[in-house]
Amino acid sequence: MTTREYDYIICGAGSAGNVLATRLTEDPNVTVLLLEAGGPDYRFDFRTQMPAALAYPLQGRRYNWAYETDPEPHMDNRRMECGRGKGLGGSSLINGMCYIRGNALDYDNWATHQGLENWTYLDCLPYFKKAETRDIGPNDYHGGDGPVSVTTSKPGVNPLFEAMVEAGVQAGYPRTEDLNGYQQEGFGPMDRTVTPKGRRASTARGYLDQAKTRPNLEIVTHALADRILFDGKRASGVTYLRGNERATAHARREVLVCSGAIASPQLLQRSGVGPGAWLKELDIPIVLDLPGVGQNLQDHLEMYIQYECKEPVSLYPALKWWNQPKIGLEWMLNGTGLGASNHFEAGGFIRTRDDDPWPNIQYHFLPVAINYNGSNAIEMHGFQAHVGSMRSPSRGRVKLRSRDPNAHPSILFNYMAEALDWREFRDAIRATREIMRQPALDRYRGRELNPGADLKSDKELDAFVRARAETAFHPSCSCKMGYDDMAVVDNEGRVHGLEGLRVVDASIMPIITTGNLNAPTIMIAEKIADKIRGRKPLERANVPYFVANGAPARNVAKAVRQPETV
């Protein structure tokens, strides 16, 4: 067994861990050990580097932990997919590359919780900007010299994108030019984490590329964190496995857990920090009975509303193997073409009821009919909307099954456990059908393939959701930030009741944000990095942002009305 000593040990080189490793080692007097259970960020592997290949990493286990849930009781007892990134970059290495920060009111809502007053949107915005380089330049809402490359959608990429956005507007919903700017609510172009050369902009590329040559940063891959070590109530180090070899590293200052919403509570529980009754079941010595560890688990559930496309403008031909070498060659040589986009270039956020204070439904538009993980491709020209609710009241949990660090935990999201979930999904299907019926899509819209136009009653729609809805791969909130009895960390990520230990990743969100989670996770890490370094927070932003204040969710008077049948 080898033993070494560092100022900080970071467990997990993902969206948050790479931010911390980079920011902490800006101080040459600080030493950092970054542990990653997966392998390097192989730049020659098109599966992780080509944006259009985003489904491939989810189909194997090289880059994906490939967790499965326990049978979900409200989803026909299905064991559902729970993909999480494995390798330098973490889930930013395998995600859909949608750059969505969340709604301003997400953060203002966090700040209404005791002790989280400094997590308002205006407190967080400077850290979003710090992390970002937007291809069309900075403004009051966007950064221009950060590590994360953000590419904006350009007109003319595919006519279906513009048609679907226009259809949303024709249905009476707002148009927005920037889902990350003044107004998230509405339909418009979607930003993505792709470099100017058409490569995936993971945090391994954006952050670690500038930090990995620093002498005060040691990166160890294929290193699976086993347990956090404690000296009394103070975290003193980490034991980890590299193959069959066990190693120990000691932390002079802090251990920083950045393993994600599944593995962070798993590591804490394995180390003796968690619900006491759970730990006793596995004969784990209790360091601290902390009941919230692994509780409050949240995710976004989504469904695919799919249509036949009457004109041959979809991406269906790109799914054929004989067309893919040409696409790949253009991407490899020039960084352009179909391979250089994730093809989520338009989308939106709407309120389905006037009394919703901010959007409760998200749309990703896609000019092909296929599941996110590449399965169940429709054998014809088609298009779809990925549609899902944003702040489900259902809560799940992550529970340790075994002391073996290689064993997956028990995961239960408890999807669709509340009546509000069902109402929102029914509303979402009906709103989507109304959008898809608008004149902007007349030349393209064929048959409704899924759910199928004949499914109309609440009972029929509910059965479709139970059988066909899937994860959006946004697990979060399982080590929540706050000061109530179920909070795990304080407003700086420090674990309650312990010293020298923080959790910094999507697990500390108290409530899931409205949209994709990579950008908020990076922001959280940027913000807490300043806290760890003892630096003064960035100056609070002073910009306006949209608040509905009870305004109608859609302008029915301006909506173009069409028959319900297609």
Curated annotation (Swiss-Prot):
Transmembrane segments: none annotated. It catalyses: choline + A = betaine aldehyde + AH2; betaine aldehyde + NAD(+) + H2O = glycine betaine + NADH + 2 H(+). GO terms for molecular function: betaine-aldehyde dehydrogenase (NAD+) activity; choline dehydrogenase activity; flavin adenine dinucleotide binding. Its cofactor is FAD. Keywords: FAD, Flavoprotein, NAD, Oxidoreductase. Belongs to the GMC oxidoreductase family. Involved in the biosynthesis of the osmoprotectant glycine betaine. Catalyzes the oxidation of choline to betaine aldehyde and betaine aldehyde to glycine betaine at the same rate. This is Oxygen-dependent choline dehydrogenase. It comes from Burkholderia multivorans (strain ATCC 17616 / 249). The lineage of its organism: Bacteria, Pseudomonadati, Pseudomonadota, Betaproteobacteria, Burkholderiales.
